[in-house]
Each structure stands twice: as C-alpha cells, then as structure tokens.
C-alpha cells in the first residue's frame, strides 16, 4: 500500500487545462532504513509572499477511529485536518485510561473493554501526544494540519501524492522520533511541471522508539 493519503482539498482551477503531476516522497533513517508513520505535508511555495493562496481545505469533516489492541494504539500516527473528529475504541480485554496533556486539546477517557469513546473534535493545528495512564508503553500521535495535502508514510517509508497542480511547493516531514520541539524538516521550492512524476527523499536522525523506551516528557507536545 502506498500510504494512506489525506488530501485536504485541491483547487480545481489550478489543475484546469493541465495534466496533474505526481510526487513520491520516501523517508529513511540515517542508515537508509525505511521510516513509516512520518507525516508529509505540502503547501504552495511562498504563497503568502506572492499574494497567492493555498487551495482551500475540504468542507466536510471526517471521523477517525483509533483502536487499542494488544496494548498498542492503531494507528500509531493519524493525520487530521482542523474540524475532524477522533474516537478511541478499546478492543483489549483490559481497561485503558486514554489521556493527553497537550495544550492543543487536553482530554481523558476511561474505557472499559469493548467500549468506544464519544467523538472528540480537533479544532487546532498541531501535534497531540496521547498515552494510556495504565500502560505506559502505549503512545499515539494526532497530527492536525491545515496544509492542502498531507499523508503519512507506509511501512516502506513511502507516500505518493497524485493530482498535484504544476507549480512550486514546500514539502515538510515530521515523525514522532524526531527530537521534540523542533521544526519539521523541509525542502523548499520543489518545482513540478504538468504531467511530471518526481521522487523526493528525506533522511531523518531519529531518537529511540518511545513505545519501547517510554519517556513521559517526550509526549508533552
């Protein structure tokens, strides 16, 4: 599977009269190993400086369900746009206490086995780190972005954006194992021609997996 792409909206007039471009983004670590669950976002290059605007976000919000099974959150990282909702489902045989200290959206749910929380609306852009107050190794990240195009990489470290208009773009990458409180990695001014298929690579320096070496401070986004 080539990643689960969440396209936040494409302005139809940008694509009119031109064949769409395609951009494949691959993310690896410094050893060249593929990095899954990296969030890739794309915006128009220098949109504000040039007086232009990014394509508007799609109007209909969606509901995402994060499962808890085998003492793990699935998916580990999920991508949202502002206005989307999230619900947590407990598919385990034990109780979970789902919580976040994030200033963007602090919350907590105590979920008995087989129970799904009420949907919770995510209004602000940013990253929300979520844990279980009973099982410290359980960690989940909600990435809320108003970028026109956003997706997370698959297990091969790859995501493909199709139907992009011709133009210049800034491509950003974020992953939970990057050092916290630092900006996303970015490659600016990536130019795509109509009908062009292009590949772009990012190599990340990553911290140890916090699900295996839990650090409560690392979750405070």
Predicted regions located by residue number:
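Extracytoplasmic copper-binding redox domains, predominantly the cupredoxin/blue-copper superfamily
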Residues: 20-221
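N-terminal signal peptide c-region/cleavage motif recognized by signal peptidases
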Residues: 15-17
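Bacterial N-terminal signal peptides that target proteins for export
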Residues: 1-7
């Amino acid at each position: 599977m080539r990643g689960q792409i969440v396209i936040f909206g494409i302005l139809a007039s940008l694509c009119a009269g031109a064949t769409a471009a395609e951009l494949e983004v691959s993310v690896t670590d410094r050893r060249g190993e593929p990095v899954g669950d990296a969030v890739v976002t794309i915006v128009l290059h220098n949109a504000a400086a040039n007086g232009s605007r990014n394509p508007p976000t799609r109007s209909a919000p969606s509901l995402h369900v994060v499962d808890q099974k085998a003492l793990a959150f699935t998916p580990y990282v999920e991508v949202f746009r502002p206005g989307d909702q999230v619900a947590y489902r407990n598919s385990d045989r034990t109780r979970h206490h789902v919580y976040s200290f994030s200033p963007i959206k602090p919350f907590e749910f105590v979920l008995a086995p087989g129970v799904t929380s009420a949907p919770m609306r995510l209004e602000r852009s940013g990253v929300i780190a979520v844990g279980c107050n009973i099982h410290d190794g359980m960690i989940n990240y909600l990435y809320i972005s108003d970028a026109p195009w956003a997706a997370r990489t698959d297990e091969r470290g790859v995501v493909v954006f199709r139907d992009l208009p011709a133009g210049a773009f800034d491509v950003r990458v974020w992953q939970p194992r990057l050092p916290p409180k630092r900006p996303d990695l970015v490659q600016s001014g990536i130019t795509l021609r109509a009908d062009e298929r292009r590949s772009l690579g990012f190599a990340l320096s990553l911290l140890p997996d916090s699900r295996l070496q839990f650090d409560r401070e690392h979750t405070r986004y």
